[in-house]
Amino acid sequence: MQKKRSRAGAAEQEAASDDGEMSDSSDKMEVSQNKGKSGIKRAPEADDVLRPVKLSKSDLYKPPTNDELNRLKETENLFHTNLLRMQIEELLQEVKLKEKRRKTIDGFLHEINALLGTIPETPKTDLTDQSWLSSSIKVPFLQVPYQVKGKFSFLPPSSIKVVGSYLLGTCIKPEINVDLAVTMPQEILQVKDNLNQRYSRKRALYLAHIASHLTDNKLFSSVKFTYMNSNHLKPILLLRPQGKDEKLVTVRIHICPPPGFFKLSRLYPNKNNVRTSWYTEQQTETEGVCDPPTPYYNNTILSDLTLEHHLHHLTNCATDFPGMKDAIALLKVWLHQRQLDKGFGCFNGFLASMLISYLLSKNKINKVMSGYQVLRNTLQFLATTDLTVNGITMATCSDSSLPSLPDFHEAFQVVFVDPMGVVNLCADMTASKYRQIQFEASESLKVLDDTNVNGFHLLLMVPKPFVRTFDHVFHLTNVAKLQGTCKKMKLLNQLIDRGGDYLATALPYLLSVLSKGLGPRVSLLSHTLTHKPEWNVGEEPAKHKDSGLVTVGLLLDPELYTNVLDKGPAADSSEALDFRAFWGEKSELRRFQDGSICEAVVWTGGSLYDKRKVPELIVKYLLELHANIPESCINYTGNALDCVLSRGRETSTEEEKMVSIIQSYDDLSRKLWNLNDLPLTITSVQGTHPCLRYTDVFPPLPVKPDWSSYHLLREKKCLIPNPEKPCPAYVSPVKVICHMEGSGKWPQDKDAIKRLKAAFQIRLSELLSSQHQLLCNPSATHTDVYKDGYVFRVQVAYHREPQYMKEFVTPEGMLKYQDTEESMQLEMETNHLPHLSSTLHGLHQQHPAFGGTSRLAKRWIQSQLLGDSFSEECLDLLVAHLFLHPAPYSPPSSALVGFLRFLHLVATFDWKNSPLIVNLNGELKGSEYTEIQNDFISARAQLPVMFIATPKDKKDSVWTKNQPTAQMLQRLIVLCLESLRALEQQLMDPRGNHDYKMIFRPPLDLYDVLIRLNPKQISRHREAVDQPAKSFFRGMLKEGAQVKDLMFPVVGYDPIQLFLQELREAYGEFALFFHDLHGGDVIGVLWKPSSFEPQPFKTTNVKGRQMDGKSDKALLVPNAEAFVEDLEILGEGLVAGVEAQTERWNI
């Protein structure tokens, strides 16, 4: 039975704010979670798992009604599942405005209407004489230049009408915006007010006078100004009710001219309405020079003229078409979750409504379609239609005097013309922003077509913040520098058109330059601007230099973005001149292998660490060359966390080290395959160390030990630590599983198999030494091979050994099989782990960011002292899920964005009620997904708290079977939420704290005892998050140093881990111990609350306890003071000090 989640299937939802038909407001939408009563019932147990309801036989076989049959047929035709239909219906029910609330809003609107009619008139004055305005009110308009012709006086509005989504019935919660169109009387305006911002300034003065008479009225909790869609030429007034309804609604006052007042032909995109001589404050116009067109300025006035006409158009379309209203609501939610519905040049609710009406007029949709069908068709249209090349128009009039689509394309980057044929609804949208919308629509359709995912949840419930969507993000921190950009690019005409807004003027040109320069390295480039906020009516509007940040995001091509060479045209071609002009001094002539001589640009990049910085180098170079934006004004965060994967003072993330290890491993594999005189044939050689799948946080380095720092065992040609010297650097053995063929020579007793394997280990050592001159150190369980500076730990395996370990004989003499801890461990090491490692190695080849993402995730887990609770394989699988099931995103192409998504996945996944399915190699099919879900639900109480299913492990979750505990998982979820919030805030606010290592420093105040460690004895000291203040010689010679005779280094020696093991064995019943494996200099100790309950006086309870002096009975309690003393005694030489944080103790 399918599990149903009522109330749109989620407890929390960030959804679209209601932008009205012109809105860009945004806030989180809370969707309540009420479990449906149909087919679902809560089990009485405390495990809080959903279980099927048992129906009576009569209910089970009752024939369906006609309505039910019709609904089932409709569901089958329109939706993947009945669940999707129910989720959409519940979401619409949640976001639509209830009738009770509508009545409250209507009452508020009537009161506003009455107040607007009582505002007194003012005498007629020059536009520049604003002395009549109250000194406590500031005009919401940047009046530059200040001098302008014209007269102004305030007269009561000629009409006040509700426009936008409220009347249409398409506004959605949580924030309801109601748009009021307040029409200025014709007497205020003059015929030539379309020129030189006269109308715009009269509009602002009219708004300011209204604000002065409403600001102290007790009806309102707040009266504020803001810009409509961050367009500074269109200020509006925001009114919110007093009392409990303050957050219910925001009424937005739009000032507009009387219908038909301005002659439309004067405002076509090829006409000029802002004189250059006026804007530059020149006394006379230059003779023979025509003023350039002002399409953006003209479009702003036209949009005010057509408010009512657009409402009538949408009302006619929505008549007898309930699916249109539902689709608008769904599309608003979709846009909001992707942060596309707010700010300058956004795709808001009004635009979505007009697009749906366009599709209706072109018969792409019809009035019998459901909201879901309309949504799908709209997304399909967006994904396949490029409005930057082939604009669309809703105009049906054949008037030849109207501007043509080519006229609009000449003036605007994106073209969508309104029904009147004069307004470009996408005038402020850049081509880059539209391509982002296209990309999101295309990705969303893929999600909807995938029956193995919850498309509703991914499309409409999961937020896609900008910083988590793009692989690299950078900020232009000093917007004032764009003034110089406009001058450098000679954009005076465009600047005049934009009313001096140099950010909006320069942005399209900057994006064009970057897109050309980055070329195939990026598959998508887009931007977001800081949303211009509301401000009090007594404050001056923010100047352009205070506009905030310009943030640009790059979606990288994983194969191409690290390219260090840009090959240009042939040196003698006509394009070569343009190439040199674009790249400046970076362009040079180069001869290529095919003999051609071409222009080229070469970027420095020896290591992969350097190559990942190529997009950053290109961005900074081009912005300085073409836009006069210095490097100091660019905050590039794409590689912000590389520093935590570097050792000590090194500036490398060591991918090349892993490639070197893999090459050495491949060579060893060949040597093993080709060994002569082995009693049995080798059937497979498989590496299992994380570095062989590119996920080791700090891969092993080639080592050459300095004899003087060790004691020498000459007969074994190996070294042992010298206690008088600092602990040697940690040498990690690279584990290799060597499977031998099955044969009758193998015994059938598990102990005999172990002895035979030990003999094989010795024989392997002898053959590798004699045939390939490798230094080997055999033992009963493995053979260590010292090769190329690395130590490979070769372990012989026999595929039937785990089976023999499971054998036991019953008292009746029957042979049976039962899993034992030993058999499961061996099976994991010799079967599951080799297969997983080879699969993840392949995944990294397909997605190069996989390794870096996994390394960051593991480094962060260790830094939070939780490394012992989560296996490396568990974390690798969590990261693999991000790449194999990235929806609603595309697979990450940078480790940073992969890490952000890792934090979000762990923090938000429903671990209690859902298995995390990782479809490695795409082996799982639809029916297997259902099988895993059903098996999980039926056996939930017996399964691990974190359940990860793979094609080879559908029922057991072997990598999380023992760890984490419920408490550790809950702790991780809390840390993920907080770290995600902090890191995203840092990445999106370049003016704040730039210490990205902050989230890698654990809070220590929650521990009861802190054990400070002696840095001399920390073998991985250089791996610490913060570079150690003092370094020690760890007994290793520098790379390239010559040695006379090789000696086996000290392998796998980490005294801190050995100390931790002792502590857990001795005091595990009293406390938990936490440590950062990678250079952590502190061990955190937490008391176990249950261990401090008094125990009866028995010999079995005496260890670590003392008599309870407060009790009359013979009871024992833990001796905490002695425990603290024991820590220093046990850790002599390792422990620098013990801090008992007794203020936390609750004993």
From Swiss-Prot:
A Pfam family it matches: Nrap_D2
UniProt similarity note: Belongs to the NRAP family.
InterPro entries per UniProt: NOL6/Upt22 (IPR005554), Nrap_D1 (IPR035082), Nrap_D2 (IPR035367), Nrap_D3 (IPR035368), Nrap_D4 (IPR035369), Nrap_D5 (IPR035370), Nrap_D6 (IPR035371)
Assembly and oligomerization: Part of the small subunit (SSU) processome, composed of more than 70 proteins and the RNA chaperone small nucleolar RNA (snoRNA) U3.
GO BP annotations listed: ribosomal small subunit biogenesis; rRNA processing; tRNA export from nucleus
A GO cellular-component term linked to this record: small-subunit processome
Main location, first listed in the record: nucleus
Record region (Disordered): 1-49
Keyword hit for RNA-binding: yes
Protein's cellular compartments: Nucleus, Nucleolus; Chromosome
Bias-annotated ranges (Acidic residues): 15-24
Keyword Zinc-finger appears in the UniProt entry: no
Gene3D superfamilies: 1.10.1410.10, 3.30.70.3030
A single GO molecular function term of this UniProt record: RNA binding
The protein's role, per its UniProt record: Part of the small subunit (SSU) processome, first precursor of the small eukaryotic ribosomal subunit. During the assembly of the SSU processome in the nucleolus, many ribosome biogenesis factors, an RNA chaperone and ribosomal proteins associate with the nascent pre-rRNA and work in concert to generate RNA folding, modifications, rearrangements and cleavage as well as targeted degradation of pre-ribosomal RNA by the RNA exosome.
Keywords: Chromosome, Nucleus, RNA-binding
Protein name: Nucleolar protein 6
